[in-house]
């Protein structure tokens, strides 16, 4: 920002009148006027709530796009003539592109217009989804590629949208907003299954499910452009103050800063443990429950290529119901407990994970004796796991400086997927296969092998609880640092030198350099 300095005027009534008038006297004396003060940034509450509602709606569509293909997976396999192993690659391609893209969007989201990046992501995933519905069966590789583009678009939204919410609200309002936002993860996942299978059944063509989603995406894009403001980073924490651009740092400086932020590091490891368990449960739990029914004599063994079972539907309904209740329960407990204990958030996460471990263990052990008890404890375990989603997002936003939150979200997503749900289904299946190789070939032994392989999830969830206890030890210190003006990824010397330079420019003087 530049200032203009006028030369002093001598003589004449005009110069005398100027010198008598305060500000005009400064002009007459030849001193520099400070630049005009920027208008403080503020946003009415109703605009913030409206923007949050739009972001929640888009999050619903985001996860519907994630799980619409699994809802019509059998039809996709028949159309493209692909086996189960190749069908599994659809999700692998999706997750891989999401993992590669998340750090890129995190970097861009910390430095450029987040609203434009979100719009690009919606256009990308809706365009890829629509175009995939017109691909001929001879070009199945194009269909796989399109799922990769959908994953890339989803990465932009999953990385940046929570940071926008974090800049719209603070404290209890932020916790409630994040709770509502993360409710749409299980709801969107379940609706993706329902929409895909229902539209395919009504129209007789699975591709119409992919053609319907872009209509909803177009509405979401219009709402985003019209109703969601371009919020300055850290705006909620500085409501009513002048929004000053912070010194820009490199991506390596951001990562180095996050690596020294122990609350972020330990909470990310805790989230990874949660992702490990949810990934294994989501993939193997329906089959485990199906084999439990076979052992109890309630279900005939599957001798056909397509097995008809209600276990997937029941498990999906449990996931949606427990997800909604769990997210709201965790957010409300965090909001109330924070009033008496500043370390409430990681302590709630740790206690819920420690309580999940025995529930999961009992659900596995009791499945061979009573299926009803297994369902009850499995539902309790999923409920306790869901209590963490909004709380861990609130932890991240409270311990990371605003200009680095996009990178933090991206790194947390990447680590949680790479070390969590990307490998846990394979590891669980590998342990089950190794155990089956050493046992007689029977339905009972198949069930017991999968049952024993699930025990690694109980261990992982206890480990995650320990990481959240470590988070509690550092939480207050990291929150205080994130609230301090000028703190961030740059070293203190760099910040001091840049502040000195800016003050020199404003005062019309320069600082000598060696």
Curated annotation (Swiss-Prot):
Biased composition (Low complexity): 9-21
Location(s) in or outside the cell: Membrane
Residues passing through the membrane, by range: 54-74, 88-108, 116-136, 149-169, 176-196, 212-232, 264-284, 313-333, 347-367, 376-396, 415-435, 453-473
Chain intervals with Polar residues compositional bias: 497-514
InterPro entries linked: MFS, MFS_dom, MFS_spinster-like, MFS_trans_sf
Keywords, in A-Z order: Lipid transport, Membrane, Transmembrane, Transmembrane helix, Transport
Residue span of region Disordered: 1-22, 482-514
Entry membrane topology: Multi-pass membrane protein
PROSITE patterns assigned to the protein according to its UniProt record, in alphabetical order: MFS (PS50850)
Domain of life of the native organism: Eukaryota
Assigned protein family: Belongs to the major facilitator superfamily. Spinster (TC 2.A.1.49) family.
Reported function: Sphingolipid transporter.
Protein name (database record): Protein spinster homolog 3
UniProt organism field: Mus musculus
């Amino acid at each position: 920002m530049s200032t203009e300095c006028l030369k002093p005027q001598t003589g004449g009534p005009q110069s005398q009148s100027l010198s008598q008038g305060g500000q005009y006297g400064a002009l007459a004396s030849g001193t520099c006027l400070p630049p005009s003060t920027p208008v403080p940034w503020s946003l009415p509450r109703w605009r913030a709530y409206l923007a949050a509602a739009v972001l929640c709606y888009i999050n619903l569509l985001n996860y519907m796009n994630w799980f619409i293909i699994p809802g019509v997976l059998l039809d996709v396999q028949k159309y493209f003539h692909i086996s189960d192993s190749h069908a599994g690659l659809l999700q692998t391609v999706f997750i891989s592109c999401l993992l590669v893209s998340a750090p890129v969007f995190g970097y861009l989201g910390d430095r450029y217009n987040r609203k434009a990046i979100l719009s690009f992501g919606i256009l990308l995933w809706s365009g890829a989804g629509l175009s995939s519905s017109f691909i001929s069966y001879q070009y199945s590789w194009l269909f796989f590629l399109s799922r990769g583009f959908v994953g890339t678009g989803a990465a932009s939204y999953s990385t940046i949208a929570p940071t926008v919410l974090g800049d719209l609200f603070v404290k209890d309002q932020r916790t409630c907003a994040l709770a509502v936002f993360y409710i749409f993860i299980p709801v969107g996942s379940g609706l993706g299954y329902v929409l895909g299978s229902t539209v395919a059944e009504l129209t007789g063509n699975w591709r119409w499910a992919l053609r319907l989603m872009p209509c909803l995406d177009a509405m979401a894009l219009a709402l985003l452009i019209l109703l969601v403001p371009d919020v300055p980073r850290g705006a909620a924490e500085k409501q009513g103050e002048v929004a000053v651009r912070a010194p820009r740092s490199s991506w390596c400086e951001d990562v180095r800063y996050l690596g020294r932020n122990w609350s972020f590091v330990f909470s990310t490891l805790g989230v990874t443990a949660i992702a490990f368990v949810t990934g294994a449960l989501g993939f193997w739990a329906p089959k485990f429950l199906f084999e439990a029914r076979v052992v109890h004599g309630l279900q005939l063994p599957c001798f056909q290529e397509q097995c008809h079972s209600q276990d997937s539907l029941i498990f999906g309904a449990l996931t949606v119901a427990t997800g909604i209740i769990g997210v709201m329960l965790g957010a409300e407990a965090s909001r109330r407990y924070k009033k008496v204990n500043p370390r409430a958030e990681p302590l709630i996460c740790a206690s819920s994970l420690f309580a999940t471990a025995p529930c999961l263990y009992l659900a596995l052990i009791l499945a061979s004796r009573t299926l009803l008890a297994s369902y009850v404890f499995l539902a309790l375990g999923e409920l306790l796991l869901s209590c963490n989603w909004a709380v861990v997002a609130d932890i991240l936003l409270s311990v990371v400086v605003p200009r680095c939150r996009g990178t933090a979200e991206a790194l947390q997503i990447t680590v949680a997927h790479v070390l969590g749900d990307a490998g846990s289904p394979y590891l669980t299946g590998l342990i089950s296969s190794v155990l089956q190789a050493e046992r007689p070939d029977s339905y009972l032994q198949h069930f017991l092998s999968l049952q024993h392989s699930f025990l690694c999830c109980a261990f992982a969830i206890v480990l995650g609880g320990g990481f959240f206890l470590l988070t509690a030890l550092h939480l207050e210190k990291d929150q205080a640092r994130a609230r301090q003006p000028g703190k961030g990824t740059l070293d203190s010397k760099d910040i001091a030198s840049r502040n000195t330079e800016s003050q020199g420019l404003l005062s019309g003087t320069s600082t000598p350099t060696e």
